């Protein structure tokens, strides 16, 4: 534990270990390495004293006290606020500011527009962490294939795999139904077309990769879902920290015109997610705007990053 904590104050490059000299006086040699598990940074510590060896792995998060509650890029239009929406904290807004709107005869009900400081935003959003962006591009690319020992999906499959061991890859047909499946730890689930997570699925710390991922109503667990087309979280799901949902579409110059009204990432009513939601589309969308949709009584605790549109009817405790 001490070696991992000490490494947080040091620069650790992916694939290169860092020796920690602070432990030499105790006769302990420690080495910390960094790699990515899905989109999450994972650090591994190995400490040796005499003939004893201790290993520890941990996911790493960062707390940024300067991150605003809201950052809306400046596209020469004001932000519109309606209903009972409330912005608490610092907000970066377009030069034209924020104005009260009206939907079906309902205006804005609060006495203040922003409960915090306001600043002018830029035409570009702050970039994702470069390493996270690279991982997302890699894992949503058409040539991506996870590496590891392959296990064929079957009903009642149970896999618990330590991060000290080789990754286990669960695959099967183009469509994977995780009915009554238990997967914990160093496991990747990969499908060519679609993964369906059921309420009977027990998933913890695993990574799901497919063009489309559907999470059934009432699902509980914590995992990463990484897709190139769409993610749907059904009603009443409880996805614990560090859950991560990410969609990145291909960057093509001749994208088809979008005629769908459904969100690219949909969080249905009554669901709670602790972690991060990312939607990245580097190309310009034709037709109807693509968006993240967070329904009424849905709660996100953490960060939402969206470089297109966001329809927020629920609550976000963190940053957008």
Question: Which residues does each PLM region occupy?
Answer:
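Short, ordered "entry" segments at domain starts
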Residues: 33-175, 179-202, 207-209, 218-219, ...
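Eukaryotic tandem repeat interaction scaffolds
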Residues: 221, 227, 231-290
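Short amphipathic beta-strand and strand-loop transition segments with alternating hydrophobic
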Residues: 16-35
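Short, glycine/acidic-rich hinge or "gate" loops at secondary-structure transitions
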Residues: 10-16, 104
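Membrane-proximal N-terminal amphipathic helix
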Residues: 1-12
